């Protein structure tokens, strides 16, 4: 009986260490390939580093966030994107003012671009948008062209689904559907908003991959989205478009992760 009790306590201890420390703080770099007829040979192998849901603040201190950004930079990605929820607390300016100088250290060959998430708005709606625009790296409600030789693709970003404007057709106006179009959005539910312009790939976060996933069944019992299909990895929206959901880095509500480690997603474009 004592031996059984010892093993039960040991298992619970190891699970606790895994949930509270290992999976939360040991950020993995996971590659995902996206293949499309619109990816030209010039962009074959093009790597996009996805930074989502940092949630700087309680239990995610400044030195750790800086370490994460340095690790992303060490990947020497072609492009880096921030998908929002950079802070945790509501109704405070402090975390926003501290995290943005760190975010601006994010580097890639073709630059780093950002959109905001709901937590950024909840901290201070006006200030979060002001800091985003002042960073010089905002892609909120706009688009840019990324070029390689004579090839190009469109990178666009939309405001948060819960707290900002989401007008996909407007931000893609003036672009052409023959070109690859990648849209950044914090919340994957944004992809289900009505739009006529074709999007080839949405890059999103928000769900933390469910944060807690049931082993063997590979699902999360709690997801902060309308469409329960949007948990982690590549999914399809109701228009048949590809949506990628990153597991992200931080946590919400409970400071744990279970079978869902913190992650920097690396999207690798592939031509046919």
Please place each PLM-identified region on the residue numbering.
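Mobile, glycine- and charge-enriched loop segments
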Residues: 27, 31-60, 158-188
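N-terminal membrane-anchoring alpha-helices
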Residues: 1-42
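Conserved beta-sheet core of the metallophosphoesterase superfamily
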Residues: 188-265, 272
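Beta-strand-turn-beta hairpins that frame and shape the catalytic cleft
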Residues: 35-49, 144-156, 176-178, 236-243, ...
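Membrane-embedded segments
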Residues: 42-140
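Active-site metal-binding loops of divalent metal-dependent hydrolases
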Residues: 51-56, 84-87, 118-119, 142-143, ...
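Binuclear metal-dependent hydrolase catalytic cores centered on His/Asp/Glu-rich metal-binding motifs
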Residues: 130-137, 148-185, 191-193, 197, ...
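Conserved acidic residues
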Residues: 78, 85, 179-181, 200
């Amino acid at each position: 009986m004592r031996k059984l009790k010892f093993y039960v306590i040991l298992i619970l201890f190891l699970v606790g260490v895994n949930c509270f420390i290992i999976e939360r703080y040991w950020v993995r770099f996971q590659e995902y390939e996206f293949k499309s007829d619109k990816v030209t040979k010039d962009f074959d192998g093009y790597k996009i580093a996805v930074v989502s849901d940092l949630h700087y603040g309680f239990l995610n201190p400044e030195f750790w966030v800086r370490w994460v950004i340095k690790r992303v930079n060490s990947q020497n990605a072609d492009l880096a994107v921030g998908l929002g929820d950079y802070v945790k607390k509501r109704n405070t300016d402090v975390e926003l003012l501290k995290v943005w100088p760190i975010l601006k250290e994010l580097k890639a060959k073709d630059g780093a671009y950002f959109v905001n998430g709901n937590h950024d708005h909840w901290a201070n709606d006006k200030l979060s948008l002001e800091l985003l625009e002042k960073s010089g790296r905002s892609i909120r409600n706009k688009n840019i062209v990324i070029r390689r030789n004579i090839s190009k693709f469109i990178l666009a970003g939309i405001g948060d689904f819960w707290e900002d404007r989401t007008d996909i057709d407007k931000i893609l106006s003036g672009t052409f559907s023959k070109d690859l179009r990648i849209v950044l959005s914090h919340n994957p539910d944004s992809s289900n908003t009505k739009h006529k312009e074709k999007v080839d790939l949405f890059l999103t976060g928000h769900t933390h991959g469910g944060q807690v996933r049931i082993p063997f069944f590979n699902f999360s019992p709690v997801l902060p989205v309308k469409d329960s299909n949007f948990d982690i990895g590549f999914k399809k929206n109701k228009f048949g478009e590809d949506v990628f959901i990153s597991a992200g880095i931080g946590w919400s509500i409970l400071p744990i992760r279970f079978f869902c480690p913190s992650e920097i997603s690396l999207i690798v474009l592939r031509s046919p």
